[in-house]
Amino acid sequence: GPASEPPGSVSAGGEEMFVFTRDNLPGLDGSTSTAPLARAMCAVLLGEDLDQVAELVNFSRTTQSFRNLMAGTADLVLAAEPAPEVLAELEGEGRWLLTPFATDALVFVVNRDNPVDGLTADQVRKIYTGEITNWSQVGGEDLEIVPFQRNQGAGSQTMFEKVVMEGAEPMEPPATWTSNSMEGLLNAVREYDNSAAALGYTVYYYANDMEMARGLKVLAIDGVTPSAQAIRAGEYPFLNPYFVSIDRDAPPDSPTRILYDWVLGPAGPTLAAPEG
């Protein structure tokens, strides 16, 4: 039975079992937001603990990870949706499989001292287009809203522009209101001007990480608080898939194709239940 199988043995079609080792594990790359998931995946497949496999998950972020795949320096990418121009490059080459495997949510966070507990999707859009500028307009204190954004090309920024703004042009943020990293953005919202003026976004996976979420409050959107259940049920409004991507010519018996099939199969990872 399964108990006798070595760690990480996965079905490779038919009755064949394939055992992943450090020697045959495909080179992984991806987004900041999928790195925790990839670490959990490596731990399961290699039968090692999370600390041991951390060195195998050295992710170069969404845009760069797809470029690495196209350049041949990564075998399998687990990432947020690529920015439109990167997607165009992938599709132009016609040789990359890009398949959704899990859903994540874009969540909005404020300093925990901010009395506002929720916004509507429309209010969020109006804040980011500059139509709503003060927290008092959405039931909060008389305080200017400081809406942070991520850098262009970041997975969460692409998701923000697609699922939140729906084509509306966000205002050009001052340089001090953008952050080049997820951690930087959360720190900014936590500490900006020692006040509760800031608003920012991250993915559910990160907002669920206790260390990351320290001092922050996640807002309900349209009355729905993001939770694993609300994401799975599709009730929370700001959802987007994560993708797994490989070379479509990877042979059926290659570790890359076997891992791709495993990610998409019933044993594969889901984001709605963060590990640990």
Protein language model features and the residues they cover:
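Exported/periplasmic ABC-transporter solute-binding proteins
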Residues: 1-276
